[in-house]
């Protein structure tokens, strides 16, 4: 169903399912609040969709889809990102997940014929399909990280509704560097920033932007401590400035987060290579994105953002 038709009681059931059954390992837990889930579907230009699976009037599965704009191979199109796929642990291996995916995609296309593709993300256990991209995601403990001092002319700003135009202009001027550039709408990005789900920082010298860093509150707990994720970076400066500025942002996050995961895409390899010279990573997770109903050659990690 359309996200705006989801009832309050359904949202409560969704949160109960996600909090209890979405992702749980011995030392890693996914603990979202409703404010970490529903803003992803709000302030969208196009519709978002939720599919729910019931057994004996009890919700045992859910899946969602929300619109993203893809710039790939010199063309632009809308895809629907499949997220929050969750099946109750007592009902797994009953073919519920494949049925959810197939039914969800069919209903999306039926209600909105312009939907031609979907985008999936997989971690650890990858599919045998041809991926859009495969890369590694690294998890670090930031406790002993050092911070590099920046020159007084360097400013790091936190992006918000008042200065979002700075980021928009920087992206417009730099997205040609990547063969594939995928974004949500600006209105949705602002909603995610306002609700503390996304953080974006820009490095500015003399009113010119030289780098941007994108972070996500993943609601994931490692060893009972919160974590933050760097899911993308854009570099238009020296490696030294790029690394030093990142260290200052990480220092800020250390007040509230002990762990950080960094996806090795776009320009982030420069940061990761510097970190692993001094610190060991806790986890190295194979990660991939897949298109459904769209064929393309796999990208290199630095070609994707």
Predicted regions and their residues:
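Active-site/acyl-donor-binding loops of N-acyltransferases
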Residues: 115-155, 211-240, 244-305
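Conserved GNAT-family N-acetyltransferase fold
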Residues: 51, 63, 85, 213, ...
């Amino acid at each position: 169903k359309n996200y705006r038709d989801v009832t309050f009681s359904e949202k409560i059931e969704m949160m109960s399912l996600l909090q209890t059954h979405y992702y749980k390992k011995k030392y890693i837990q996914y603990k979202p609040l409703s404010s970490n889930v529903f803003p992803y579907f709000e302030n969208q230009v196009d519709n978002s969709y939720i599919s729910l699976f019931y057994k004996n009037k009890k919700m045992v599965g859910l899946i969602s889809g929300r619109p993203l704009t893809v710039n790939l191979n010199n063309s632009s199109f809308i895809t629907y990102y499949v997220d929050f796929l969750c099946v109750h642990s007592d009902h797994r291996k009953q073919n519920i997940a494949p049925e959810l995916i197939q039914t969800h995609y069919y209903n999306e296309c039926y209600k909105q014929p312009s939907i031609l593709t979907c985008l999936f993300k997989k971690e650890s256990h990858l599919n045998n399909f041809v991926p859009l991209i495969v890369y590694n995601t690294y998890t670090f403990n930031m406790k002993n990280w050092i911070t590099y001092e920046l020159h007084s002319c360097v400013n790091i700003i936190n992006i918000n509704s008042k200065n979002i135009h700075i980021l928009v202009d920087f992206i417009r001027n730099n997205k040609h560097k990547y063969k594939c550039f995928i974004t949500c709408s600006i209105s949705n990005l602002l909603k995610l920033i306002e609700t503390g789900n996304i953080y974006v920082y820009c490095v500015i010298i003399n009113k010119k932007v030289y780098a941007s860093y994108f972070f996500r509150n993943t609601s994931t707990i490692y060893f009972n401590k919160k974590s933050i994720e760097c899911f993308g970076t854009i570099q238009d400066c020296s490696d030294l400035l790029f690394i030093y500025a990142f260290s200052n942002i990480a220092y800020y996050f250390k007040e509230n987060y002990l762990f950080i995961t960094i996806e090795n895409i776009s320009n982030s390899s420069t940061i990761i290579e510097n970190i692993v010279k001094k610190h060991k990573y806790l986890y190295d997770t194979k990660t991939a994105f897949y298109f459904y109903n769209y064929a393309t050659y796999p990208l290199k990690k630095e070609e994707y953002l």
